[in-house]
Amino acid sequence: MSEPHLLIDAGNSRIKWALADAQRTLVRTGAFGHTRDGGADPDWADLPRPRGAWISNVAGADVGARLDALLDTRWPGLPRTTIRSRPAQCGVTNGYTTPEQLGSDRWAGLIGARAAFPDEHLLIATFGTATTLEALRADGRFTGGLIAPGWALMMRALGTHTAQLPTLTTDIASGLLADAQAQPFQVDTPRSLSAGCLYAQAGLIERAWRDLAAAWQAPVRLVLAGGAADEIARALTLPHTRHDALILSGLALIAAEASAQD
């Protein structure tokens, strides 16, 4: 049996990891914080030594150094590759005017989406610290995207930069809206803020999807991913598909392609 690949997605809020076998199946997964204060270290004690680590890191140099230390402690000398966006890879063509400016997480997510939904036009909406949208044609061409503040960031910005509005987390907002989803307008300030920011997310997605379908004159599958996807999905009036492992799946494909060329 060939050695597995260790895949690491270091996002703006947390770090997710997976172990992928030779068939690119994610056989073990987990998550941990950027710092020890953010939670325990990853539970890698019983993992077999991987062939190498493939990393998407959009969280910065400090997180990169933490990952290096964790890897060196568990598997000294383990080969590792921090991916960068390319003009083309794994069947996806990068439409950015400067391809390397595209975040490595978005690039890996596009590759994962292309493999999960081959030969389909896609709008991929990922809900994290930022909300990102990617337009991917059925032939693998990424034609561009959008970046907006995420749901939590929208609410935090309003709480921080106004005198009378509360600062809400997504957990608080979800609780407030649990019994109010059927109401288009809310009757107190916390719920109004929660729902307003939620509808801003949903409105962005629906407008982008309609514009894309009109421009391409073809059906477009809407794919949702990320931590806030459940709440935003409930506010959408469009059919959609949930997939929460696009980035890790894309990393598995990148690792497999590179290993095949060794």
UniProtKB/Swiss-Prot annotation:
Instruction: Name the EC number(s).
Output: 2.7.1.33
What Pfam families has UniProt attached to this entry? Answer: Pan_kinase
User: Where does it live in the cell?
Assistant: Cytoplasm
* UniProt-annotated binding residues for substrate: 96, 103-106, 189
Supply the SUPFAM superfamilies for this chain: Actin-like ATPase domain
Q: What are its cofactors? A: NH4(+); K(+)
User: What reaction is this protein's catalytic activity?
Assistant: (R)-pantothenate + ATP = (R)-4'-phosphopantothenate + ADP + H(+)
Keywords annotated in UniProt? ATP-binding, Coenzyme A biosynthesis, Cytoplasm, Kinase, Nucleotide-binding, Potassium, Transferase
One of the record's GO cellular component terms:
cytoplasm
Q: How is the cofactor bound?
A: A monovalent cation. Ammonium or potassium.
Q: According to its UniProt record, which residues of this chain constitute the active site?
A: 105 (proton acceptor)
| Database matches in NCBIfam families | baf, PRK13328.1-4
Query: Which family does the record assign?
Result: Belongs to the type III pantothenate kinase family.
Q: What does this protein do?
A: Catalyzes the phosphorylation of pantothenate (Pan), the first step in CoA biosynthesis.
Q: What is the official name of this protein in its record?
A: Type III pantothenate kinase
Species this chain originates from: Burkholderia multivorans (strain ATCC 17616 / 249)
